[in-house]
Curated annotation (Swiss-Prot):
Pfam families: tRNA-synt_His. InterPro entries: aa-tRNA-synth_II, aa-tRNA-synth_II/BPL/LPL, HisRS-like_core, HisRS/HisZ, HisZ. This is ATP phosphoribosyltransferase regulatory subunit. The gene is hisZ. GO terms for biological process: histidyl-tRNA aminoacylation; L-histidine biosynthetic process. GO terms for molecular function: catalytic activity, acting on a protein; histidine-tRNA ligase activity; transferase activity.
Length: 383
């Protein structure tokens, strides 16, 4: 039965991968996973579908999930990320495992997005059971090393701390309603909207000054001194010192030059509690790496454990890379006797070559023409 026009398309935001594209993705994914393994991270996998009771969104995230019902009427969700799924798995299947626990993954995730892409290939890590600044620095350094290994392009890592934002808001005493609007615009880097919002509320001069400077406060470690001029509140001082320590450890890891401190980073998921970071590459208008500390999440699953991690949007990086022909056949085998063609192809494959065999009898001229069309450099006649 002929397909309708809808049957010839794919759902909005989903994608096919052609051979060259898939080869490039698999190569990048393997490079990342090999690196994670070298840092003692073990690969895990979770179901594509989770119960909605596991993936509990905050209000602003709920509409971004793909939902359906099973035959018992339970709400199911296509996983929008792996962090929560891994928290469920660790808290149930791996309870009692010695901490710190280092896990990694490669998987597709699904969520509605303003970029019109709804299916994302991710690689990432979770470091569970350590509250130290060294753990925060480790995952940032590992994200940087992964980008260096798989991307082959310039990138920038921005590092911040959720406690600095909440501490400044508490010091200024701004209304909760204003804070939510301000936070939303800050996360979008909507500087014009921030200026209009601050002026509309008519705060005193000192408060306005801090609120307008905060979005532009980024750079190296000395930038943190400006924050301490605004307040010495204990919670704020603790957050500043924690961020400062992470940044210094990154120098020990040899990756500090890739990192800029940015106090305007506010992660989109509600569970981030400490150091947070984002990574950008040229040509992509959103972060290709997102991560940070989420110490409260495991408590929701009955396992009180601090944790940190990151995810790399592999699809976004692949789109900026040039597809290679690395996975295309190297040899085309032809001949008049199919049995001999099969035997010759088997022999060549045993040497490690990628071999395509002609399924019909071809002349040498026809075989050469076919190889040229397919980009195959070597042609062998089976005799």
């Amino acid at each position: 039965m002929p397909r309708s026009s809808l049957g010839l398309r794919i759902p909005e935001g989903m994608h096919d991968l052609l051979p060259d594209e898939l080869a490039l993705q698999e190569q990048a994914e393997t490079s990342a996973l090999d690196l994670f393994k070298a840092w003692a991270y073990q690969k895990v996998a979770t179901p594509t579908l989770e119960y909605g009771a596991c993936i509990q969104p905050v209000e602003e995230e709920g509409d971004s999930f793909f939902k359906l019902f099973d035959r018992q009427g339970h709400v199911l969700v296509l996983r929008p990320e792996l962090t929560t799924s891994i928290a469920r798995m660790v808290s149930t299947r791996m309870r009692g495992t010695a901490f710190p626990l280092r896990l990694c993954y490669a998987a597709d995730v699904f969520r509605y997005s303003k970029s019109h892409k709804q299916e994302f290939r991710q690689v990432g890590v979770e470091l569970i059971g350590s509250a130290s600044s060294a753990a925060d620095a480790e995952v940032v350094a590992l994200a940087i090393e992964a980008l260096r290994k798989i991307g082959g392009m310039d990138f920038q890592i921005n590092l911040g701390h959720m406690g600095i934002f909440t501490g400044i808001m508490a010091e200024l005493g701004v209304p909760q309603e204003f804070q939510l609007h301000y936070q939303e615009k800050l996360a979008r880097k909507d500087f014009v909207g921030i200026e209009r919002l601050v002026k509309d509320y008519g705060f005193e001069t000192r408060v306005q000054d801090v609120l307008l400077k905060l979005p532009h406060l980024h750079g190296k470690e000395d930038m943190l001194d400006q924050v301490l001029e605004w307040s010495r509140r204990p919670s704020l001082l603790e957050a500043v010192n924690a961020l400062r320590q992470v940044y210094r450890y990154l120098k020990d890891f040899g990756v500090q030059d890739y990192v800029s401190l940015d106090l305007g980073i506010l992660r989109g998921f509600s569970y981030y509690t400490g150091a947070v970071f984002e990574g950008y590459v040229p040509g992509v208008g959103f972060p290709v790496v997102e991560g940070g500390r989420y110490d409260a999440l495991y408590g929701d699953f009955g396992e009180d454990a601090p944790a940190t991690g990151f995810a790399i949007n592999l699809k976004a990086i692949i789109e900026q890379m040039v597809c290679s022909n690395a996975e295309r056949p190297e040899v085309l085998v032809y001949g008049s006797d199919v049995s001999k063609v099969i035997a010759e192809a088997r022999k060549l494959r045993q040497t490690g070559k990628r071999v395509e065999m002609c399924l019909e009898s071809l002349t040498q001229e026809q075989a050469m023409e076919s190889a040229e069309c397919k980009g195959i450099k070597e042609v062998v006649c089976a005799r």
